[in-house]
Amino acid sequence: MGKGTDKLYITHSEWASEDAYSASAGAGVGKARRGVGEASFKRLPFRFCSLSLQPFEHPVCTQSGTIFDLTSILPWIKKHGTNPVDGTPLKGSDLIKLTIAKNDAGEYIDPVTYKVLTDNTHVVALRNTGNVFAWDTIERLNIKGKMWRDLVSDEEFTRKDIITLQDPQNIESRDLSRFNHIKEGESGLSDEQLREREDPSRNVNVNALGSSAKILKAREAVAKARQERAQKAGNAASTPVAKTDAPVKSAQKTASYQSGKPVPYNAARYTTGLAAASFTSTGMTPHTSAELALLSDEDYMLKRGRVKQKGYARISTTSGDINLELHTEYAPKAVWNFIKLAKKGYYKDVTFHRNIKGFMIQGGDPTGTGRGGESIWGKYFNDEFEGPLKHDSRGTLSMANKGKNTNSSQFFIAYRALPHLNLKHTIFGHVIDDPTPSSPTLNKLETHPVNPTTNRPTPDIRIVDVTIFVDPFEEFLKQKKQSEQSAENEANRTAENDEEGSRRAEDDQITWTGKRVRGPGASKEESSTTVGKYLKAALSERAAHDEDEIVEFVDEEPTSEPAKKKFKGIGGFGDFSSWD
């Protein structure tokens, strides 16, 4: 017998479960909820550039086999200096020019077998020549035949010169959802391409529109004129925002984003929610306008990429000094935490409680046990893994943690490359002692005797003090204050010039006898209190907006007004003489 609570239909919770798989839920919805990448997989075709996502015309590739268009990747490298796909450093000299054969139909083919290179073809290129082949051709004619010469140019190559451009068995390398520049929302198109894409008439044949083409051209001219006037008005109305030297505390302030009012530099992308709360609760003070929340100076600066200046510090230990470079651009929270704790004197007389030769040295715990320490906020803060920083060299400075998002005050310095720690520990600095990275102090710390059971240095290695040479956050605030001060001075000078000009104009209206001459706006002022003042104001306002009219560009012949027909009257009233 069934239970009384059994439903004769599928409930909402069953549809929304992780195991849901049907036409209504959609294939792969369970994988999407669990974070599996297959649900959002989007494959980049072979003939497309990995940056502009458009068909390439001048193909080049990297050492890892990522294909770009030369006209798209060079401006990116000049601006960012990284590989837009994986975020690793990239130079223009690292690019390899590709030579891909085409058939009469314009399709890319193998130059030997004339096989068309599709999205499912295993495609490779030779590093020294740049010629592109199908993998079957290289395998049958070169590898199995032990003939290590380019089949087109007859140049020698080795197995290491073979670069895989596309492998149908490894389609993850062409997954758009994994591209770094797409994750960060950065476009690979040039400014000219963006303007062309945003142009609504880019696919319209203007020459075939006849007289309507003049209307489109006039509309474009009017839009351009409006944009120029808006820019001039915005530059004239913008005023600097006052800011104090001391950081604002966590209490949020608000700012209205009504039209015509400048938005503060630290305005958040979300509102305070007071309008919605007062609408749904009678206990709230009524608010009729949405107000943007203001971020504190700390929250404003700790956004990744906001402060790009490097920080510099020195750790003085009982075994010597270690000079550090702090990567504020990629790990602002970790750098802020380290600098604030150092200025607070938190690391003074703190021991390095763990030292493993060939691995790393760890410290920053005031208790000396490895289980203590807290951040400047008094709680754990999140990891910062976005960026090109890796544990790829000796002297890397990273945060120690107990798991995901458990960073506090402890840090460690690596003695070698530790790739297994990537995406597990936040990298926020590097040792810059000369000769880098094998500093004498770091070598001395690595060879320091330790307890083989606990890996604790014997005798203890203590941090005498941490000196901050360059605080990037203070420099950022100083530069911002100077720019605001200069903008304020410029606004004051403009206001003084305007006031002086108006005073001179007023003086010109008074004669040497003391009589005031009627100015050009006097008649308007006198008539402002007379009958019909609102009608005149409306007419003047309408005339001010007449400059955007475009009807004058319509090329049509005027039509003459039809002549009125003459009405033939039937005469006046009769005298009834015709009546019998």
UniProtKB/Swiss-Prot annotation:
<comment type="pathway">
    <text>Protein modification; protein ubiquitination.</text>
</comment>
<keyword id="KW-0413">Isomerase</keyword>
<feature type="region of interest" description="Disordered">
    <location>
        <begin position="479"/>
        <end position="530"/>
    </location>
</feature>
<feature type="region of interest" description="Disordered">
    <location>
        <begin position="227"/>
        <end position="259"/>
    </location>
</feature>
<dbReference type="GO" id="GO:0003755">
    <property type="term" value="F:peptidyl-prolyl cis-trans isomerase activity"/>
</dbReference>
<dbReference type="InterPro" id="IPR002130">
    <property type="entry name" value="Cyclophilin-type_PPIase_dom"/>
</dbReference>
<feature type="compositionally biased region" description="Basic and acidic residues">
    <location>
        <begin position="490"/>
        <end position="507"/>
    </location>
</feature>
<dbReference type="InterPro" id="IPR026951">
    <property type="entry name" value="PPIL2_U-box_dom"/>
</dbReference>
<feature type="region of interest" description="Disordered">
    <location>
        <begin position="553"/>
        <end position="580"/>
    </location>
</feature>
<feature type="region of interest" description="Disordered">
    <location>
        <begin position="439"/>
        <end position="459"/>
    </location>
</feature>
<dbReference type="InterPro" id="IPR003613">
    <property type="entry name" value="Ubox_domain"/>
</dbReference>
<dbReference type="InterPro" id="IPR029000">
    <property type="entry name" value="Cyclophilin-like_dom_sf"/>
</dbReference>
<feature type="domain" description="U-box">
    <location>
        <begin position="42"/>
        <end position="115"/>
    </location>
</feature>
<keyword id="KW-0808">Transferase</keyword>
<dbReference type="InterPro" id="IPR044666">
    <property type="entry name" value="Cyclophilin_A-like"/>
</dbReference>
<dbReference type="GO" id="GO:0016567">
    <property type="term" value="P:protein ubiquitination"/>
</dbReference>
<feature type="compositionally biased region" description="Polar residues">
    <location>
        <begin position="439"/>
        <end position="457"/>
    </location>
</feature>
<comment type="function">
    <text>May catalyze the cis-trans isomerization of proline imidic peptide bonds in oligopeptides thereby assisting the folding of proteins. May also function as a chaperone, playing a role in intracellular transport of proteins. May also have a protein ubiquitin ligase activity acting as an E3 ubiquitin protein ligase or as a ubiquitin-ubiquitin ligase promoting elongation of ubiquitin chains on proteins.</text>
</comment>
<feature type="domain" description="PPIase cyclophilin-type">
    <location>
        <begin position="309"/>
        <end position="468"/>
    </location>
</feature>
<keyword id="KW-0539">Nucleus</keyword>
<dbReference type="GO" id="GO:0071013">
    <property type="term" value="C:catalytic step 2 spliceosome"/>
</dbReference>
<protein>
    <recommendedName>
        <fullName>Peptidyl-prolyl cis-trans isomerase-like 2</fullName>
        <ecNumber>2.3.2.27</ecNumber>
        <ecNumber>5.2.1.8</ecNumber>
    </recommendedName>
</protein>
<dbReference type="Pfam" id="PF00160">
    <property type="entry name" value="Pro_isomerase"/>
</dbReference>
<dbReference type="InterPro" id="IPR013083">
    <property type="entry name" value="Znf_RING/FYVE/PHD"/>
</dbReference>
<comment type="similarity">
    <text>Belongs to the cyclophilin-type PPIase family. PPIL2 subfamily.</text>
</comment>
<feature type="region of interest" description="Disordered">
    <location>
        <begin position="182"/>
        <end position="201"/>
    </location>
</feature>
<dbReference type="GO" id="GO:0061630">
    <property type="term" value="F:ubiquitin protein ligase activity"/>
</dbReference>
<dbReference type="InterPro" id="IPR020892">
    <property type="entry name" value="Cyclophilin-type_PPIase_CS"/>
</dbReference>
<keyword id="KW-0833">Ubl conjugation pathway</keyword>
<dbReference type="GO" id="GO:0006457">
    <property type="term" value="P:protein folding"/>
</dbReference>
<keyword id="KW-0697">Rotamase</keyword>
